[in-house]
């Protein structure tokens, strides 16, 4: 049986000494496709009118913002808090989003603010561009999209139930 080590852990560790893995194959392939097509430059060009060149605090880069939204989409995260947490937690996602090991993940409020800053048409244009590149790169088949929208009646409060036959 092993025993707990009592030695003091090192205070500084070089990033080259940190254990690394090849990363998530999907994000590696996705990143390669987006990089080859110039995604970050395209996103910056599309979003240029929403960013002031000299005013305010530094904002989230458009390429990084849309990469975060892609992570949220592919992992089923519908809240900015979940996207920010995932970016802070996963090294593969950090690599895809272009976050260095020493950089903090964007705060959920920054993601939310950026979402409100950029209009719907620009979001649609960028996601359409990404979708076309992913179909061409073989990550999406591009044949059909299924949407499930089921409407269900719900009883909000059991005390307010009224029988239909007696009114």
Label the predicted regions.
Residues 82-96:
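DNA-recognition alpha helix
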Residues 1-44:
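Charged, often Cys/His-bearing segments associated with DNA-binding zinc-finger transcription factors
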Residues 42-45, 69-70, 94-112:
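Peripheral, non-cofactor segments flanking catalytic/redox cores
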Residues 64-77:
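Alpha-helical support elements that line or immediately flank enzyme active sites
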Residues 35, 56-64, 79, 103-106, ...:
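Secondary-structure capping and boundary motifs in well-ordered enzyme cores
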């Amino acid at each position: 049986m092993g025993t707990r080590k009592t030695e003091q852990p090192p205070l500084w560790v070089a990033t080259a000494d940190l254990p690394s893995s090849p990363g998530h194959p999907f994000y590696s392939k996705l990143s390669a496709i987006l990089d080859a097509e110039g995604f970050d430059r395209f996103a910056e060009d599309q979003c240029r009118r929403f960013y002031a060149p000299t005013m305010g605090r530094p904002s989230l880069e458009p390429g990084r913002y849309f990469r975060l939204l892609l992570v949220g989409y592919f992992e089923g995260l519908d809240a900015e808090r979940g996207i920010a947490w995932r970016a802070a937690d996963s090294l593969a996602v950090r690599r895809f989003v272009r976050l260095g090991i020493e950089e903090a993940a964007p705060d959920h409020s920054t993601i939310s603010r950026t979402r409100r800053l950029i209009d719907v048409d620009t979001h649609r244009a960028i996601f359409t561009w990404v979708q076309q590149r992913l179909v061409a790169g073989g990550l999406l088949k591009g044949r059909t999209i299924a949407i499930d929208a089921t409407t269900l009646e719900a009883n909000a409060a059991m005390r307010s139930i009224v029988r239909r036959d007696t009114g």
